[in-house]
């Protein structure tokens, strides 16, 4: 008996089904680094149009977390896809290296008792160690970039250019010095920027306090009354009793309606909309009478006594007063609130600040001198009770500003700081706020809702406090007049001279500078060096100038900034403000893309206490970095990204589908040489031409839509669907018979391989931006060998086809696929009851509408191959219907079809006539399937 197994074209795949990624990826990385892949790519891409994604610098402190991994993976997918789209897309990774967290770590490791120069030296060393640690993990994720020459905000050149950016803003006229209330962290001992503030719930005392009116006759007149007997109070409500020693006024809303109410306590002034709730808090249900009503503008300039200090308190009108909660009257302490400051400034009230930088009251403050503001709260409540001016006291849980580093409550505190003014007219007569809002309009957002979010933040943000009272940071290199506080008239020129020194020696050049080196002897008598450093957000917000504008391979403005959604109030905003406030006069980016935060499968934040933290190091060590990359790409990053072991296992299934498809494709291309064996398109079997069209359409969707629009989850879904539906469940299922049973060098088989070659080459290029390791592994086989890279090539060029012919081809095979699905469904009951095993054991009689029947009949004898049955007949009817039955033919032991011609050819007793032709003669021909 003849063994026909050796006559079928079953080839071994050079692409194993098991990726073994976790073990193999590090070796690939080593090889790519040794081959200088990134540097070669820069040479190959030279002269192409540029695409610049500017890296938002992560902070150089601690191991990378899963959020870092998502961010870098998304950036890498974009860089790779843009490269394959024909752009020169260099990627320069960066790190944020100055600031308090590093100071804190150095203090923990080395203590505080050392010269400041040594302290800064240790900060620089610590930051460099952290950069090296994080860099290793980013590279392990497959992120392609200039890792040998990243940018660091502590590079001497970058520090110098950050100083130059300060000079730009100074020359533009937006920089000023002022004593304003700013968010102040008592643990940091410094002011904080907007982006350094986070909000958490806090329990605070909530109190109602009466301010006794001085002149009840004037109060009566304001309410249209002839007179008032007894005491009268303006009642305020506050959750910060500690600010009362700084209270300098009470604010009323000009259009708010107020009532004068007679109560057992005396006459109370309360907002009409809040009076009922307020009186309940005071326990007044009887003996109440509403005496009169008036509006807040009539109360303006009335005077009261402070509730426990000897201080005159005027009544002001403020736009910030609402009737959402409280009493409708607001105690106003300009040292401890921006709105308070603004309204007092309007009335010419000079700011009084009784709280020092340690959060303690100065010695002149009665009863609470030397106490912290938090310690003072109960003392102040006791004081109010003694004076009889405390109407109610309770506890309230509310959202409150906290330091993002220390997680401790912040206070507003007026300090002398340097600001970038939002509403100050610059040298060009325009305000920074107006420029920034215009810049938002000129920016493209992904997702689109980012526009409204950033615009609202810019519209509502205060002036940017850019000075810090720290040691490890880029210095504000100004010379300030000792008496007037004015900057030296030659500040612009002096800044540049200092920047040149910093470029050589780093920021220590400023701290060690003797002012006599740059100033005349006379100027030295009148000017001092400023000791403040800059907000770290100014450092990172200036990198578009210090990095993008300076590095030869980059172009300004950047095409894209991509960060987490919290950066609307962080890096996106600080970069926009420095861009708009400088001579560039615009945002330093054309597009902004934001991604959500990573949560667990239940939507909870990652937390060590919950035990749901998924570390990227654990993922790539267990599953491989390509699985982490596929997870990041397959998740809609516009919302939260859920991750867990179970989710990663599901992602692994998708990866396996792609990998198994590639393994099959490579097996059946292992004896195919595209130069010698390819079949011209016009001579290809029809279904092969159709499959190539499907692959080209997939490429058009990914290369023309999903990758350019950054919708990677659609790309992954489409790739997996193409592998499982178009290929696995349809084309490859049909193709196996032709690949395995026709003659190895026949046109029928070479046509199939030609289609597979186009499909495989395109598919490898399409997956490569996401599955960078798998893509390169596959390209080693189908590309130019180990020294070649998938990144050295642009999207696959498919053979062209007449548009009309293509449309007809797709229409025809779409109908055939529909018929095949109906046939498969009709056979299913026969398989379920074991009447047949495979579909080849069945025959099908198809009734179809005329057009579909025409398409099916056009395939003639080859219809059975397209439908995966041993026999198929077609007749015309009103709708699609299929009758399936078991074949009464005999099974061919070579092709497994059931036919009535097994043994019909002498010498081939166990195989069908077709197989006899393929084994011993010229072989069959195919036209359609």
From Swiss-Prot:
State the EC number(s). 6.1.1.5
Give residues annotated as binding ATP.
608
NCBIfam families referenced in this protein's UniProt entry, alphabetically:
ileS
Describe the protein's quaternary organization and the partners it interacts with: Monomer.
**Stated role:** Catalyzes the attachment of isoleucine to tRNA(Ile). As IleRS can inadvertently accommodate and process structurally similar amino acids such as valine, to avoid such errors it has two additional distinct tRNA(Ile)-dependent editing activities. One activity is designated as 'pretransfer' editing and involves the hydrolysis of activated Val-AMP. The other activity is designated 'posttransfer' editing and involves deacylation of mischarged Val-tRNA(Ile).
According to UniProt, the reaction catalysed is:
tRNA(Ile) + L-isoleucine + ATP = L-isoleucyl-tRNA(Ile) + AMP + diphosphate
One cellular component (GO) term of this entry: cytosol
Q: Which family does it belong to?
A: Belongs to the class-I aminoacyl-tRNA synthetase family. IleS type 1 subfamily.
Q: State the top-level EC class.
A: ligase
Residues annotated to bind Zn(2+): 892, 895, 912, 915
This chain's source organism reads: Neisseria meningitidis serogroup C / serotype 2a (strain ATCC 700532 / DSM 15464 / FAM18)
Q: Where does L-isoleucyl-5'-AMP bind?
A: 563
A biological process (GO) of this protein is: isoleucyl-tRNA aminoacylation
In which domain of life is the source organism classified? Answer: Bacteria
This chain belongs to the protein called Isoleucine--tRNA ligase
Record key words, sorted? Aminoacyl-tRNA synthetase, ATP-binding, Cytoplasm, Ligase, Metal-binding, Nucleotide-binding, Protein biosynthesis, Zinc
């Amino acid at each position: 008996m003849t063994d026909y197994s050796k006559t079928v074209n079953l080839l071994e795949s050079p692409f194993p089904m098991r990726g073994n990624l976790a073990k193999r990826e590090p070796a690939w990385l080593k090889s790519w680094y040794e081959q200088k892949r990134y540097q070669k790519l820069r040479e190959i891409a030279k002269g192409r149009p540029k695409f610049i994604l500017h890296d938002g610098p992560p902070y150089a402190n601690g191991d990378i977390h899963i959020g870092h991994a998502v961010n870098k993976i998304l950036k890498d997918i974009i860089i790779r896809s843009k490269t394959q789209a024909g752009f020169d897309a260099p990627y320069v990774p960066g790190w944020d290296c100055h600031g308090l967290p590093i100071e804190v770590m150095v203090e923990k490791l080395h203590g505080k008792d050392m010269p400041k120069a040594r302290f800064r030296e240790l900060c620089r060393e610590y930051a460099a160690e952290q950069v090296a640690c994080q860099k290793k993990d980013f590279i392990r994720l497959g992120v392609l970039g200039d890792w040998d020459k990243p940018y660091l905000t502590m590079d001497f050149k970058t520090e110098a250019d950050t100083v130059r950016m300060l000079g730009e803003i100074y020359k533009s006229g937006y920089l000023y010095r002022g004593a304003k209330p700013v968010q102040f962290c008592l643990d940091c001992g410094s002011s904080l920027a907007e982006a350094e503030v986070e909000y958490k719930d806090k329990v605070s005392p909530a109190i109602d306090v009466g301010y006794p009116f001085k002149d009840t006759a004037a109060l009566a007149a304001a309410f249209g009354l002839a007179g008032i007997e007894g005491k009268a109070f303006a009642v305020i409500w506050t959750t910060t009793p500690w600010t009362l020693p700084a209270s300098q006024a009470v604010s009323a809303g000009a259009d708010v309606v107020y009532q004068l109410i007679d109560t057992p306590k005396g006459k109370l002034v309360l907002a009409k909309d809040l009076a009922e709730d307020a009186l309940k808090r005071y326990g007044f249900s009887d003996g109440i009478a509403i005496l009169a009503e008036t509006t807040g503008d009539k109360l303006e300039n009335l005077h009261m006594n402070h509730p426990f200090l000897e201080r005159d308190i005027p009544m002001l009108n403020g736009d910030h007063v609402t009737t959402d909660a409280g009493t409708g009257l607001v105690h106003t302490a300009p040292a401890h609130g921006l709105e308070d400051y603004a309204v007092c400034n309007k009335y010419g009230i000079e700011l009084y600040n009784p709280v020092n930088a340690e959060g303690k009251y100065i010695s002149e403050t009665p009863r609470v001198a030397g106490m912290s503001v938090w310690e003072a709260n109960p003392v102040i409540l006791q004081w109010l009770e003694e004076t009889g001016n405390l109407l109610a006291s309770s506890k309230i849980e509310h959202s409150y500003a906290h330091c993002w580093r220390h997680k401790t409550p912040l206070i507003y505190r007026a300090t002398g700081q340097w600001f970038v003014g939002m509403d100050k007219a610059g040298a060009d007569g325009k305000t920074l706020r107006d420029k920034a809002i215009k810049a938002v309009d000129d920016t493209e957002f992904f997702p689109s809702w980012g526009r409204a979010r950033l615009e609202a933040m810019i519209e509502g943000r205060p002036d940017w406090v850019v000075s810090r009272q720290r040691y490890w940071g880029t210095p504000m290199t100004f010379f300030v007049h000792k008496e007037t506080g004015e900057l030296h008239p030659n500040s612009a020129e002096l800044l540049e001279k200092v920047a040149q020194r910093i470029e050589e020696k780093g920021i220590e050049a400023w701290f060690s500078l003797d002012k006599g080196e740059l100033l005349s002897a006379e100027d030295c008598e009148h000017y001092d060096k400023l000791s403040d450093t800059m907000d770290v957000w100014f450092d990172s917000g200036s990198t578009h100038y210090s990095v993008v504008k300076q590095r030869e391979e980059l172009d300004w403005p950047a095409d894209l900034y991509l960060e987490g959604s919290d950066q609307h109030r962080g890096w996106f905003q600080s970069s926009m403000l420095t861009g708009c406030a400088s001579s560039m006069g615009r945002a330093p980016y054309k597009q902004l893309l934001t991604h959500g935060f990573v949560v667990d499968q239940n939507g909870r934040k990652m937390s060590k206490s919950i035990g749901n933290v998924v570390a990227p190091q654990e993922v790539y060590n267990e599953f491989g970095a390509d699985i982490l990359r596929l997870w990041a790409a397959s998740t809609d990053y516009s919302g939260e990204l859920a991750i867990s072991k179970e989710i990663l296992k599901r992602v692994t299934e998708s990866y396996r589908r792609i990998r198994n498809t590639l393994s099959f494709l490579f097996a059946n291309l292992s004896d195919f040489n595209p130069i010698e064996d390819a079949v011209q398109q016009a001579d290809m079997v029809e279904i092969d031409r159709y499959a190539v069209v499907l692959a080209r359409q997939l490429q058009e969707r990914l290369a023309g839509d999903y990758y350019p629009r950054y919708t990677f989850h659609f790309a992954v879904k489409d790739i997996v669907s193409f592998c499982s539906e178009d290929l696995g469940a349809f084309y490859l299922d049909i193709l196996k018979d032709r690949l395995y049973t026709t003659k190895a060098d026949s046109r029928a088989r070479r046509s199939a391989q030609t289609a597979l070659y186009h499909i495989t080459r395109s598919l490898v290029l399409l997956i490569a931006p996401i599955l960078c390791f798998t893509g390169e592994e596959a390209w080693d086989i189908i590309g130019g060998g180990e020294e070649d890279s998938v990144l050295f090539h642009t999207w696959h060029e498919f053979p062209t086809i007449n548009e009309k012919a293509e449309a007809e081809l797709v229409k025809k095979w779409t109908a055939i696929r529909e018929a095949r699905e109906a046939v498969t469904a009709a056979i299913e009951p026969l398989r379920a009851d074991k009447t047949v095993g495979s579909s080849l054991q069945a025959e099908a009689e198809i009734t179809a509408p005329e057009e579909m029947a025409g398409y099916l009949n056009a395939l003639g004898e080859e219809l059975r191959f397209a439908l995966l049955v041993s026999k198929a007949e077609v007749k015309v009817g009103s709708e699609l219907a299929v009758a399936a039955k078991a074949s009464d033919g005999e099974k061919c032991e070579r092709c497994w079809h059931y036919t009535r011609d097994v043994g019909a050819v002498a010498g081939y007793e166990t195989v069908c006539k077709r197989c006899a032709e393929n084994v011993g003669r010229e072989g069959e021909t195919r036209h359609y399937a």
